């Protein structure tokens, strides 16, 4: 896949309306096959589900968008430690390209992550994606952090729901400016905002 995909690395404010329309369609198809609820945030040309990324890596091939990864710098709290991270989210691969590995996405943005000055990349996926993340971590680029729940705010206010939720998700961390040994211990990560 890597040799057939060309990457567009861009800041959020560099995207044009046509980019958002194409990305929205990509997310509707990519997330929608796992349930209409997951696709709903992307209706109407929207290209983010919770927090809006500040940077995107968009992979294109002869058939259009092949893959996408969003990045957002933010402070999270791991246990009692405030920590700057680059959160990775809005990850998607076109269904016909799945199973070819996700490590290519991180390797494409690794130089940018170094320039951002973040000590770690942080990401979460639902439990159903465990096999994909384990494959990615086997390459040594990241580690799964077990025994941790993540608290996030909801992206929108709902009068019948609390403003935050705590989830048992797969947490993965990739060291960028520090070693993995320096990741703080704790059983709760406060995202202090909506997920990416």
From Swiss-Prot:
Function per UniProt: N-acyltransferase required for nodulation. Acts in the production of a small, heat-stable compound (Nod) that stimulates mitosis in various plant protoplasts.
Keywords: Acyltransferase, Cytoplasm, Nodulation, Transferase
Subcellular location: Cytoplasm
Family from the record: Belongs to the NodA family.
Organism field: Rhizobium sp. (strain N33)
Domain of life (superkingdom): Bacteria
Protein name in the entry: Nodulation protein A
UniProt signal peptide: none
HAMAP family: NodA
One GO CC term, this protein: cytosol
This enzyme's EC code(s): 2.3.1.-
GO MF terms, alphabetically ordered: acyltransferase activity
